[in-house]
A protein has these predicted regions:
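N-terminal active-site segment of His-dependent metallophosphoesterases
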Residues: 1-68
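Extended active-site neighborhood of metal-dependent phosphoesterases/phosphodiesterases
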Residues: 2-3, 30, 66-156
Length: 157
């Protein structure tokens, strides 16, 4: 076994926070979503104690789809909660954030260039890469695969 003298580090993965408009009850069949905002605030506090070097959010930051009128407001609320995380946060979109894959059985509206731009306005790029302690991390946007959108090809360049 090689003698590697690189110090170990930890990072955090969070997903499906489903932040909802303040004071609005959700109509989803899953009652657990009614506590989404309270739950992510607790996660933010727990992350401060865990002290990861960075956080990766795997998507579904917000509950409303980008086609809904309250999407921008809820994205701003989400960012106000996430700014309590004192470490770099790398965001990846989920179907609630940019729309669903182009398949008939998908529950959300299909991903589109308009939805991608709305997401980027709040959370930045939908794919990318970063380095930490000599490790190269690559983040991809799976929702655009087989979509025919230009971003599908762009992320592979």
């Amino acid at each position: 076994m090689p003698d590697i003298k690189v110090p170990m580090f930890s990072f955090a993965i969070i997903a499906d926070t489903h932040i909802m408009p303040a004071g609005v009850s959700d109509t989803a069949p899953y009652k657990v979503l009614n506590k989404a905002n309270q739950r992510i605030r607790k996660v933010v506090e727990d992350l401060k104690v865990q002290d990861p070097k960075f956080v990766v959010h795997l998507g579904d930051m917000v509950r409303p789809f980008p086609a809904l009128s309250n999407y921008d407001d809820v994205c701003r609320l989400a960012l106000s909660i996430f700014e309590g995380i004192p470490f770099p946060v790398h965001y990846l979109p989920g179907n609630h954030d940019i729309g669903d894959k182009h398949i008939a059985s998908a529950p959300a509206p299909q991903v589109s260039d308009i939805f991608l731009e709305k997401y980027k306005k709040h959370f930045g790029p939908t794919f990318g890469a970063f380095d930490h302690q000599g490790i190269h991390f690559i983040t991809l946007n799976a929702s655009v695969i087989n979509s025919g959108l230009s971003e599908e090809a762009d992320q592979w360049v």
